[in-house]
Design a protein with these regions (language model features):
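Short, structured active-site "lid" loops
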Residues: 43-62
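Small-molecule-sensing regulatory modules
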Residues: 1-43, 48, 67-81, 85-90, ...
Length: 305
């Protein structure tokens, strides 16, 4: 019996999302043949959607919970609850322009275009983020005040400032300069694609990763809230497994205080007596990077690590 509707992303986040859910204990089948795959939990129905659409769909309640990039949550100004950073799908939204342009920042680009009385053309998939970024620029505010840049899409045109034009891109944004655009606002992982197209990054608008997000009304429904938090709990386990390690060791009674002094103070180890007289088993979960630092010290007082 369905309790919640779960939206999973198609595209760049797709494979990593299925792997993540597999690590969380879920099995999803049929995703290559249908947009409504089967999950091994009859209380969850899954639908595959574009990550750009998921935040708004969750806000409007057609889906209860889902995964999308934080960039699309902000771009859509979606009124949703961000439950958990899933720590994958890490990207940056950047401002880039041709290597031939000597400008080192957006203010310089804008200032040059103003001096030369030339329209600044921006291509991007992120219309709202681009508009906000441009209008927050000090050079822009000084010259144009609160005038909104001209925004052009196939469906509508808005804005009053024709000196700065923001054009919607359907993709392959890095191919637009210099003929169709002077500047692009684009998403990158490593920046290699920009480099191959003779473009350089001059600013980072935001960093983004995959997030588990939920509908506010769904979280007020007792049954849905409980199921959403079940999903959240399993997702937390996967995220924490990346950054933490569960350690087990055998310790002589007279060395226990030494070991407890080495283990990070915020952790609460489990200590149980072993059948061998005078020996104890100690286990705890600690941050992975801290484990690497304390391992040499632990080996002086413990065995079986």
């Amino acid at each position: 019996m369905e309790i919640i509707k779960l939206a999973l992303p198609k595209g760049s986040l797709e494979k990593a999302t299925y792997k993540f859910f597999e690590n969380a204990g879920y099995s999803i089948k049929g995703q290559t043949r249908t947009y409504r795959p089967i999950i091994n939990d009859e209380s969850i129905s899954v639908k595959i959607l574009r990550p750009q659409e998921i935040p708004k769909n969750i806000q409007e309640g057609t889906q209860d919970v889902g995964i999308s990039g934080e960039d699309w949550v902000k771009e859509n100004k979606a009124d949703v609850v961000k439950l958990l950073n899933l720590d994958y799908g890490k990207v940056r939204i950047v401002v880039a322009l041709p290597n031939s342009n000597k400008s080192r920042n957006f203010s310089s680009v804008l200032n040059n275009n103003i001096k030369n009385k030339k329209q600044l053309r921006i291509s991007t998939e992120y219309l709202n983020l681009a508009k906000q970024y441009v209008m927050n620029n000090e050079i822009y505010k000084k010259k144009y005040g609160n005038k909104t840049p001209l925004i052009i899409t196939p469906w509508f045109k808005t804005g009053t400032n024709k000196d700065v034009k923001i054009m919607f891109s359907f993709g392959a944004t890095e191919a637009k300069p210099p003929e169709e655009a002077d500047v692009i606002f684009d998403v990158i992982e490593t920046g290699s694609t920009l480099a191959q197209n003779n473009l350089k990054v001059i600013d980072t608008i935001m960093e983004s990763s995959a997030y588990l997000i939920a509908n506010k009304k769904a979280l007020k429904d007792p049954k849905k809230r409980q199921k959403i938090y079940d999903v959240l709990s399993l997702c937390k386990g996967v995220v924490e497994a990346k950054s933490k390690v569960h350690i087990f060791m055998n310790v002589k009674k007279n060395n226990i205080n030494h070991v407890l002094g080495i283990i990070p103070s915020l952790e609460s180890p489990t200590i149980s007596e072993l059948s061998k007289n005078g020996w104890y088993s100690v286990n705890t979960v600690i941050p992975r990077e801290e484990f690497l630092q304390i391992l040499p010290s632990l080996r002086k007082y413990a065995q079986g690590l």
